[in-house]
């Protein structure tokens, strides 16, 4: 041991402390834009790392899937039980253009529909739209009591369940095939397919709470920019733009000055 050496004195680290870098300084924010089927077009923002060498931010953003409540997309709280999946297909500047990628129902809504003394009927089928999308649609329905029924239960027989399930598949196939994905999504929002099934199965057994519970996108056609832009224009074929806001100073008048002039 060397004379005069104190072990308690700690040595300084080699190189000193590293400079703390804010992680967000290496990120970029992009706006998310929904198709024109929904009322609210800009529904949020997403984050991605800046371009570094061969790593591009566009590659990290493309094909990202975002799950949004339909209540936020349409400004309607009655549609809060619907969850819409939107997938980023293209990036233009700082805007991500998304496309419909699926639909689901919230767990609490599904549990609120399931009750005793009734029969739950489910069906699913694969359909192909006119623009080349292959979807798998899941339908759910519940039996209900007749108007003059005294018995508390409303169970359907197995033969009736088979007939209802067959009718479900027929109506879903007829409504989905021959239409574009954009028109099909418009049918999902007001539950027009469920109402059609309930009306068609009335003579077999009365139904209630008929919903398209879930939609899966199994396959998509090859990417086409023109098709994507068509889904992002308004109903009149013109791309939607923001309205001009008139400043308050141009509209407001000074009441005191107006009285003095009078």
From Swiss-Prot:
Cellular component terms per the entry's GO annotation: cytosolic small ribosomal subunit
GO biological process: translation
GO MF annotation list: structural constituent of ribosome
Keywords: Cytoplasm, Ribonucleoprotein, Ribosomal protein
Subcellular location: Cytoplasm
Keyword Ribosomal protein attached: yes
Keyword Transmembrane in record: no
Annotated family: Belongs to the eukaryotic ribosomal protein eS1 family.
Self-association and partners: Component of the small ribosomal subunit. Mature ribosomes consist of a small (40S) and a large (60S) subunit. The 40S subunit contains about 33 different proteins and 1 molecule of RNA (18S). The 60S subunit contains about 49 different proteins and 3 molecules of RNA (25S, 5.8S and 5S).
Name under which the protein is recorded: Small ribosomal subunit protein eS1
Organism expressing this protein natively: Cryptosporidium hominis
């Amino acid at each position: 041991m060397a004379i005069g050496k104190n072990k308690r004195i700690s040595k300084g680290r080699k190189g000193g402390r590293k400079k703390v870098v804010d992680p967000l300084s290496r990120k970029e924010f992009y706006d998310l834009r929904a198709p024109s089927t929904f009322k609210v077009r800009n529904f949020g923002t997403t984050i991605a790392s800046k371009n570094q060498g061969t790593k591009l931010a566009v590659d990290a953003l493309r094909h990202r899937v975002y799950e949004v409540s339909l209540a936020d997309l349409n400004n309607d709280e009655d549609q809060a039980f619907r969850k819409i999946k939107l997938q980023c297909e293209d990036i233009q500047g700082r805007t991500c253009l998304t496309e419909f990628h699926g639909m689901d129902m919230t767990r609490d809504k599904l549990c609120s529909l399931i009750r005793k003394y009734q029969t739950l009927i489910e069906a699913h089928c694969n359909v192909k739209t006119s623009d080349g999308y292959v979807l798998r649609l899941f339908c759910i329905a519940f039996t209900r009591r007749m108007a003059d029924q005294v018995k508390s239960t409303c169970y359907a027989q197995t033969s009736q369940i088979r007939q209802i399930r067959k009718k479900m598949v027929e109506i879903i196939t007829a409504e989905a095939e021959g239409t574009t994905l954009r028109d099909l999504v418009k049918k999902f929002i007001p539950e027009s397919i469920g109402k059609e099934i309930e009306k068609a199965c009335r003579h077999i057994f009365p139904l209630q709470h008929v919903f398209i519970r879930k939609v899966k996108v199994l396959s998509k056609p090859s990417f086409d920019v023109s098709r994507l832009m068509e889904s992002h224009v308004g109903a009149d074929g013109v791309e939607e733009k923001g309205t001009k806001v008139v400043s308050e100073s141009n509209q407001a008048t000074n009441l005191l000055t107006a009285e003095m002039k009078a």
